[in-house]
C-alpha cells in the first residue's frame, strides 16, 4: 500500500498536536496548521506546545504554521477542532483545499443548529472530498509521549479507512477500520455524557459494581441512538471497537477526564443550582446532554441515563 508523502493536522490544541506527533512518527513531512503564531513558532523551534502539553517533546520533524495557503498540498488533512468550532473550520478550509484532499475528522460531538452528525453536516458544507472519522481512547498527553494507544477509523469507503490506518499505525498506535461512520460518531459524542454520570456515581460512593453497570447501560444507549440515526445495521461488533467501548471506559474512569471531574464535583456540591451557574470550565458532556435530548424527542427514544441527567443538569 502506498504511503502518504505528507500529512497535515488542522487544530493546535492538545489533541491536534498529539495527533500531529502520531503522524510525524510514521511520516517525514508533517505540518500542524493553527491560529496562534506563538505556539506555531514554539512547536517549530522548540518542539513543545507548553500551553497544552507541558514540556513533552514532540518529534523533530514536526513543523507548525498559521499560513493555510499550503494546506492544499497535503494528501491527508486531519481535522482536530472542538465541536463548537467545526462549522467555522470547515468553511475556512473549504477556501484553501481541493477535492483531492483526504479529510480525517477527529472532532467528537454533534454539529449544531440543527443538531446532527458531522457526516451529515459535511454533506452540506463539503460534499466532494474523501472523508473518514477517527475516534478512540486517546488521552492527548499519552499520545504525545508515544505511549501505546489504539483507535478506530471509520469511512463509508473501507479502502480509504484502511489506507489511512496503514499510514498512521505504528508499534505504539494501532488503528482498526470499520464502515459504520454513524456509530463511531454517536459513541464519541455520548461518552462525555456517561462520564458525567460516572463522576456523580463516584460522588455518591455507588461502589465498583455500579461502574460496570454504567458501561453496559451506556453501550445500550449508544446502540439505541445509533440505530435511530441509521447505524449498526445488523452488526453489534462495532460496540467492541476501541472507538466505542474503549473510548467510553477511558472517558468514564480516567482521572484526567474533565467530564468525570465535573460529575464528581456536581455530585458532592451542596447547592446544585449554584454549582452549575458558577462552573466555568469547558465540559463537552454538559452541552451534549442538551443536543441529545433534542434527538431523543425527535426520534421518540428511550435513553434513561441521558434523560435523567437532562432533568438535573441544564
Curated annotation (Swiss-Prot):
Primary site of residence: cytoplasm
Signal peptide (UniProt feature, chain positions): none
Biological-process GO terms, alphabetical: carbohydrate metabolic process; glycerol-3-phosphate biosynthetic process; glycerol-3-phosphate catabolic process; glycerophospholipid metabolic process; phospholipid biosynthetic process
Pathway: Membrane lipid metabolism; glycerophospholipid metabolism
Binding site for sn-glycerol 3-phosphate: 108, 136, 191, 247, 257-259
Pfam families, A to Z: NAD_Gly3P_dh_C, NAD_Gly3P_dh_N
Subcellular location: Cytoplasm
Reaction equations catalysed: sn-glycerol 3-phosphate + NAD(+) = dihydroxyacetone phosphate + NADH + H(+); sn-glycerol 3-phosphate + NADP(+) = dihydroxyacetone phosphate + NADPH + H(+)
Superkingdom field: Bacteria
Annotated catalytic residues: 191 (proton acceptor)
EC number(s) recorded for this UniProt protein: 1.1.1.94
Binding positions for NADPH per the UniProt entry: 14-15, 35, 108, 140, 258, 282, 284
Transmembrane segments: none
Entry coiled-coil feature ranges: none
Matches recorded under SUPFAM superfamilies: 6-phosphogluconate dehydrogenase C-terminal domain-like, NAD(P)-binding Rossmann-fold domains
PANTHER family per UniProt: GLYCEROL-3-PHOSPHATE DEHYDROGENASE (PTHR11728), GLYCEROL-3-PHOSPHATE DEHYDROGENASE [NAD(+)] 2, CHLOROPLASTIC (PTHR11728:SF1)
Function: Catalyzes the reduction of the glycolytic intermediate dihydroxyacetone phosphate (DHAP) to sn-glycerol 3-phosphate (G3P), the key precursor for phospholipid synthesis.
UniProt record similarity statement: Belongs to the NAD-dependent glycerol-3-phosphate dehydrogenase family.
Name of the protein: Glycerol-3-phosphate dehydrogenase [NAD(P)+]
Amino acid at each position: 500500500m502506498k504511503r502518504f508523502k505528507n500529512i497535515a493536522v488542522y487544530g493546535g490544541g492538545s489533541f491536534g498536536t498529539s495527533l500531529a506527533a502520531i503522524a510525524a512518527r510514521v511520516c517525514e513531512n508533517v505540518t500542524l496548521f493553527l491560529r496562534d503564531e506563538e505556539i506555531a513558532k514554539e512547536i517549530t523551534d522548540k518542539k513543545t506546545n507548553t500551553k497544552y502539553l507541558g514540556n513533552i517533546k514532540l518529534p523533530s520533524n514536526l513543523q507548525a504554521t498559521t499560513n493555510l495557503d499550503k494546506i492544499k498540498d497535503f494528501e491527508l488533512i486531519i481535522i482536530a477542532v472542538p465541536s463548537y468550532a467545526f462549522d467555522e473550520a470547515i468553511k475556512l478550509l473549504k477556501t484553501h483545499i481541493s477535492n483531492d484532499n483526504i479529510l480525517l475528522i477527529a472532532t467528537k460531538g454533534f454539529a449544531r443548529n440543527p443538531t446532527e452528525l458531522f457526516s451529515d453536516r459535511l454533506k452540506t458544507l463539503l460534499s466532494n472530498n474523501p472523508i473518514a472519522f477517527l475516534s478512540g481512547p486517546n488521552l492527548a498527553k499519552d499520545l504525545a509521549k508515544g505511549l501505546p494507544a489504539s483507535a478506530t477509523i471509520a469511512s463509508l469507503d473501507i479502502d480509504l479507512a484502511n489506507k489511512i490506518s496503514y499510514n498512521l499505525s505504528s508499534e505504539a498506535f494501532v488503528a482498526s477500520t470499520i464502515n459504520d461512520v454513524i456509530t463511531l460518531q454517536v459513541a464519541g459524542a455520548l461518552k462525555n455524557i456517561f462520564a458525567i454520570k460516572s463522576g456523580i456515581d463516584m460522588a455518591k460512593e455507588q461502589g465498583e459494581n455500579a461502574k460496570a453497570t454504567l458501561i453496559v447501560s451506556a453501550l445500550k444507549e449508544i446502540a439505541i441512538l445509533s440505530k435511530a440515526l441509521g447505524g449498526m445495521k445488523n452488526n453489534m461488533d462495532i460496540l467492541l471497537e476501541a472507538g466505542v467501548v474503549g473510548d467510553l471506559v477511558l472517558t468514564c474512569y480516567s482521572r484526567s477526564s474533565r467530564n468525570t471531574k465535573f460529575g464528581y464535583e456536581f455530585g458532592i456540591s451542596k447547592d446544585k443550582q449554584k454549582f452549575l451557574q458558577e462552573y466555568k470550565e469547558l465540559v463537552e458532556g454538559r452541552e451534549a446532554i442538551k443536543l441529545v435530548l433534542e434527538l431523543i424527542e425527535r426520534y421518540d427514544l428511550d435513553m434513561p441515563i441521558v434523560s435523567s441527567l437532562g432533568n438535573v443538569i441544564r
